[in-house]
Amino acid sequence: MEINERSFSDKALEDFELIDKAVNDKDQQAYASLMKRYKKAVYFMILKMIRGADDAEDLTMEAFAKAFKNLHKFKKDYTFSTWLFRIATNNTIDFIRKKKLKTMSLNNTMTD
């Protein structure tokens, strides 16, 4: 796919190169570089959403696992960071919903 280089930052273009290496060459170093580049930012975004350090760490790892599993589907219409943060956000929202459902079902069990 052709990329309009003027519409992306240098960092985004570097991400595209790392993604190509990860997907096409199965380059583990490329995966590691992407994770190193975004892990803290993803973690702190999730931490703001749930305010639990252990859960935030777990959800950060889950977000990267989902992103890397589907990296071959990534389209270069947007930056990798936008795509990754959307995955992390959706995964965290799912976690919050499941947690609320468990709390509600426990409350219902106790009142029955």
PLM feature spans:
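Residue-level preference for hydrophobic side chains embedded in well-ordered alpha helices
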Residues: 34, 38, 42, 63, ...
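N-terminal module of bacterial RNA polymerase sigma factors
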Residues: 1-40
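Arg/Lys-rich amphipathic alpha helix in sigma70-family domain 2
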Residues: 73-75, 86-106
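Internal acidic/polar
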Residues: 11-16, 102-112
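A short, glycine- and basic residue-enriched loop/turn
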Residues: 28, 53, 57, 71-77, ...
